[in-house]
């Protein structure tokens, strides 16, 4: 499997174009996204942290061993309810995760490719993936930096 960073709509359009050109394609499996395409900025890291902390709080330590569908679904619904209530979490900069994205993050957490860490500075828990495309450690400290607090720069 190759992670391209393309949206589902773009991939479907490519498939349609190839089929229109006479190629026959057999999809072996559904695409599976991960930290490399989902966590690419401090805003996406804030959202992943919120979603996965809710998931962990609901499912407990068992979510580190297997994906708990009921806990993930409940966390996902709570995540979207919180997004609706927080001013400023709208627009392209704050693109929401879908349920497939939530499953992918939960799978990374289960496999050990991702973890919840506690920031030494602000004591907030945040989600981090070994595959993420951002050097942001604690996204909450970075967000505080935008409002006058200290911000840790990437090395």
Residue ranges and their predicted role:
Residues 2-155:
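Long, charge-rich, low-complexity intrinsically disordered regions
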């Amino acid at each position: 499997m190759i992670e391209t960073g393309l949206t589902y709509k773009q991939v479907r359009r490519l498939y349609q174009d190839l089929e229109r050109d006479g190629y026959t394609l057999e999809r072996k499996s559904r695409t599976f996204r991960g930290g490399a395409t989902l966590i690419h900025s401090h805003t996406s890291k804030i959202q992943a942290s919120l979603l996965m902390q809710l998931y962990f709080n609901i499912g407990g330590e068992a979510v580190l061993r297997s994906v708990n569908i009921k806990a993930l679904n409940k966390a996902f619904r709570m995540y979207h309810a919180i997004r609706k209530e927080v001013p400023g979490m709208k627009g392209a900069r704050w693109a929401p995760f879908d349920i497939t994205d939530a499953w992918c993050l939960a799978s990374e957490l289960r496999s050990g490719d991702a973890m919840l860490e506690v920031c030494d500075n602000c004591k907030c828990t945040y989600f981090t993936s070994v595959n993420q495309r951002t050097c942001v450690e604690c996204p909450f400290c970075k967000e505080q930096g935008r409002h006058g607090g200290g911000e840790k720069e990437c090395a």
